[in-house]
């Protein structure tokens, strides 16, 4: 299966800062995708606010697009089951190349979040930091590889149903002596997606293969 896909784009950025207290970076990108023959506009922004000398707030938001490669991204699912697109199986009466070409593989999502970092002293002044991060990715169009739709098929389709990922993370870093860093992190992920059912209904499920809890020391 051969296809050609090229993108060309322009990016513009504006930075505003108030000495070492506050900074704002606003950017916008425009891309042309040859496969879909469409233009995509993706704005984004970042802020950094030093609330005090030892307390910093960061926040960001951005819209993003991703052109998925259905076969490469899901090669592990090719275990004897047919690949089907919006209900049409590629090894039936429908040509695989036609189905693949006509399928909308462009995902669209908005990511919003930020972090709060506090520097403090344990053994000596300012030798440790504690930060809390939260980010949410909200999908407005997502390509789903549904393994539960049918026992004999992996069904690919676009869903505009409720699909999101919430990530919470806490990081601790301590340098008690020179060249010795102690680092610990804990992350909680709540990821959910909407699946279509053969009866025409929809169901909200936890995203597969995503670890809810992660910790590192």
Regions found by a protein language model. Name each.
Residues 2-6, 18, 37-39, 67, ...:
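Short sequence motifs at beta-strands and strand-loop junctions characteristic
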Residues 2-48, 174, 178-190:
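Surface-exposed extracellular loop regions of Gram-negative outer-membrane beta-barrel proteins
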Residues 1, 36-43, 70-76, 83-87, ...:
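Outer-membrane beta-barrel translocator domains and adjoining extracellular loop/strand segments
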Residues 17-20, 129-139, 156-217:
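Gram-negative outer-membrane beta-barrel transporters
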Residues 50, 58, 90-158, 164, ...:
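Membrane-embedded beta-barrel scaffold of Gram-negative outer-membrane proteins
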Residues 11, 23-25, 48, 56-58, ...:
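Residue-level detector of the transmembrane beta-barrel scaffold of outer-membrane proteins
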Residues 1, 25-30, 81-101, 150-157, ...:
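Extracytoplasmic loops and strand-loop junctions of Gram-negative outer membrane beta-barrel proteins
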Residues 6-8, 28-34, 61-67, 76, ...:
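Transmembrane beta-strands of outer-membrane beta-barrel pores
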